[in-house]
Amino acid sequence: MHIYFCGSIRGGRQDVIIYQRIVQTLQKYGEVLTEHVSHSDLSERGEDAVQDGDKFIHDRDMEWLVMSDVIIAEVTQPSLGVGYELGSARGMRKKILCLFRPSSGKSLSAMVRGAVDGSLFQVRDYKEEEVEGILEEYFKGLSKD
């Protein structure tokens, strides 16, 4: 299974430790195409050393999005890029799970929470210690489909 993980890069790296925990868990269920999002050495500037910069990153990530079977997005830290990825994935009718931590004091965009349709697009509020269990439950549900 190809898994596309979304998390903030240029929007802020405050949650990178949580991203690492999520990606480590996701690797039990398949290949995480975007595991670099969880790397602590990736700064808010993103992948500076990439030849052709933003265009290369966009095209590569869109290719990975097309290849993916499921999208898991940590959406607590607002990110234009993650929003773009989610909108694109929804247009492709991909299975999407968004994870949001209310304890952050932030509010999740209505464009994300309002997209919930009960099957393809899901949003789960969570506490950090619950993330592995939520992902296990989600992937068990996928295997029944």
From Swiss-Prot:
Signal peptide: none annotated. It catalyses: 5-hydroxymethyl-dUMP + H2O = 5-hydroxymethyluracil + 2-deoxy-D-ribose 5-phosphate. GO terms for cellular component: cytoplasm; nucleus. Keywords: Cytoplasm, Glycosidase, Hydrolase, Nucleotide metabolism, Nucleus, Phosphoprotein. HAMAP family: Nuc_phosphate_hydrolase (MF_03036). PANTHER family: 2'-DEOXYNUCLEOSIDE 5'-PHOSPHATE N-HYDROLASE 1. Part of a nucleotide salvage pathway that eliminates epigenetically modified 5-hydroxymethyl-dCMP (hmdCMP) in a two-step process entailing deamination to cytotoxic 5-hydroxymethyl-dUMP (hmdUMP), followed by its hydrolysis into 5-hydroxymethyluracil (hmU) and 2-deoxy-D-ribose 5-phosphate (deoxyribosephosphate). Catalyzes the second step in that pathway, the hydrolysis of the N-glycosidic bond in hmdUMP, degrading this cytotoxic nucleotide to avoid its genomic integration. This is 5-hydroxymethyl-dUMP N-hydrolase. It comes from Esox lucius (Northern pike).
